[in-house]
Curated annotation (Swiss-Prot):
Needed cofactors: pyridoxal 5'-phosphate
Sample GO molecular function, one term: pyridoxal phosphate binding
Keywords, sorted A to Z: Amino-acid biosynthesis, Aminotransferase, Histidine biosynthesis, Pyridoxal phosphate, Transferase
Organism of origin: Citrobacter koseri (strain ATCC BAA-895 / CDC 4225-83 / SGSC4696)
Protein name as it appears in the record: Histidinol-phosphate aminotransferase
Gene3D superfamilies: Aspartate Aminotransferase, domain 1, Type I PLP-dependent aspartate aminotransferase-like (Major domain)
Keyword Magnesium appears in the UniProt entry: no
Gene from which this protein is expressed: hisC
Amino acid sequence: MSTENTRSVTDLARENVRNLTPYQSARRLGGNGDVWLNANEFPTTVEFQLTQQTLNRYPECQPKAVIENYAQYAGVNPGQVLVSRGADEGIELLIRAFCEPGKEAILYCPPTYGMYSVSSETIGVECRTVPTLENWQLDLRGIADKLDGVKVMFVCSPNNPTGQLINPQDLRTLLEMTRGNAIVVADEAYIEFCPQATLAGWLSEYPHLVVLRTLSKAFALAGLRCGFTLANEEVINLLLKVIAPYPLSTPVADIAAQALTPQGVNAMRERVAQILLERQYLVNALKEIACVEQVFDSETNYILARFTASSSVFKSLWDQGIILRDQNKQPSLSGCLRITVGTREESQRVIDALRAEQV
């Protein structure tokens, strides 16, 4: 066979995959820091002891203890819960289950979480965007104009990276607008920091509502990769058709079940109270620093702030081993950096470094 006609392995890949820009996760961005404040992780580890030793057997697809414990915690029925490899897998499952590649679309409202677009582009589903209003609330009129052909809409509340809650009345309007035509997904990865705002109680009113959750943030288990999809049973049954046979390993299911016991949930709430105190300390300090132009209100475990010369500030802290998340490329976030709320020692490192910046 002539080598002139031989295509490279890359040429054999799907065109949309060749053109794809992978999600820039905190670890993928690299860096040699010792103060990691760019992934909204909990700053200290939580210890568990494995109780399941049956590693010679395949795990359950949906481990009973995990499902039942999460249902109890979230106030829903076990049949309304699906567990997956992080909420990111939930995003992908929803697109695969509801969107016809090349024909239908998802919609989301930037600035927001980047995995909605990455998952849709990987699968070959059109991605539509309607930027938020100046206050980062939903542009309902703009959404209405773009809904034709949309099967799944993602709304992150509290929103990453801006930190604010989406107006609940706007969410109700959106749910009425999409009834019978599209699934509305409320991404509640950070809801433990403002639990009163959850939409889980709305599932009985809206058959097309889906809520995404995770153990990565307030439960301090980012390394576990364990997330949840809350929805009506009709939706859950569809997702069970497309999920992998064994999404959770036995050790992951073991630790997740322990984290979701009443004792585990109480420990999580104590951690949240600690983070909220630390958040206020950091906010108060940031407001007094010369290079900080604005500190935005947050309902989460991170703070978005606008800086003078943000790129040089970001690099300066990076060089000192303090890794933040640069948000300059997101719509309406020029000059903005996102700072995870860490320990008091980590907060002080950030504060001292920023105070030393020459502006």
